[in-house]
UniProtKB/Swiss-Prot annotation:
Sequence similarity: Belongs to the ParB family.
Protein role: Probably part of a 4-gene DNA damage response locus in which the upstream ups system, in combination with this downstream locus, functions in homologous recombination to rescue Sulfolobales from DNA-damaging threats. This protein might function in the DNA transfer machinery.
GO MF, one example: kinase activity
Protein name as it appears in the record: ParB-like protein Saci_1498
Result of knocking out the encoding gene: Cells grow a little slower and form smaller colonies than wild-type, reduced survival after UV treatment. Cells undergo almost no recombination in mating reactions.
Species the sequence originates in: Sulfolobus acidocaldarius (strain ATCC 33909 / DSM 639 / JCM 8929 / NBRC 15157 / NCIMB 11770)
Gene3D superfamilies the record matches: Conserved hypothetical protein from pyrococcus furiosus pfu- 392566-001, domain 2, Conserved hypothetical protein from pyrococcus furiosus pfu- 392566-001, ParB domain
Source taxon at top rank: Archaea
Record keywords: ATP-binding, DNA damage, Kinase, Nucleotide-binding, Transferase
UniProt xrefs under Pfam families: ParBc
């Protein structure tokens, strides 16, 4: 028995949980127009929350596509995991002193760490992720290169967003920063592009 089902769904039925980068949405719009095809997005069949494919989703909304291909899975399955994207920051030499400026309460359920040092914590993981995003944006403007990675040896580590929080915040209409969740599927997910239906 398959762990997923491929369906055509209206983008208006779907619930995003992550924000997007406008330039990537625009790139996706151009690709959809040029190729007339897209890789399916991945959606929880029970809640209609988008798990992967937010930029393609927003591109399809912009183009007014009536239906898009979606791989429908059971998010509650133990075969679906949510992991974190850690960060590598370069150059690394002065980053510890810079992060001390942001050091606040180290009390809280969720914490961001620089190597093994806790930088800040919060009881609300949504607030924690947006604080981290603001710091990353500031670092980028200052000339640092911030790369999100699966590497466990990365410079900055952040806890994964629990599945129930992904669903709850999506239903509240709130979005985590781009590339907050890293979903791992312990079963085959097809990635072939599918010809779009425009009517």
């Amino acid at each position: 028995m398959s762990n997923y089902q491929l369906e055509w769904v209206s983008p208006k039925q779907l619930r995003p949980h992550e924000d997007v980068i406008l330039s990537i949405v625009n790139e996706n719009i151009e690709i959809l127009r040029k190729d007339n095809s897209m890789a399916p997005i991945i959606v929880d069949k029970n809640s209609m929350v988008i798990l992967d494919g937010h930029h393609r989703y927003y591109a399809s909304l912009s183009l007014g596509l009536p239906k898009i291909p979606a791989i429908m899975i059971d998010y509650n399955s133990e075969q679906v995991e949510v992991r974190e994207w850690n960060r590598i920051i370069a150059p690394d030499s002065s980053i510890r002193d810079f992060l001390r400026v942001f050091r606040s309460s180290v009390d809280g359920k969720y914490c961001v760490s620089y190597k093994s040092d806790v930088v800040f914590c919060d009881d609300n993981i949504y607030s924690l992720y947006w604080k981290e995003e603001a710091i990353e944006q500031l670092l980028s403007r200052m000339g640092y290169n911030v790369v999100k990675t699966a590497d466990q040896e990365a410079t900055i580590s952040i806890p994964p967003v629990p599945k129930n929080v992904v669903i709850d915040f999506s239903y509240k209409g709130l979005r985590f920063p781009p590339k907050s969740t890293r979903h791992i599927y312990h079963f085959y997910i097809p990635k072939q592009r599918i010809i779009l239906q425009w009517d």
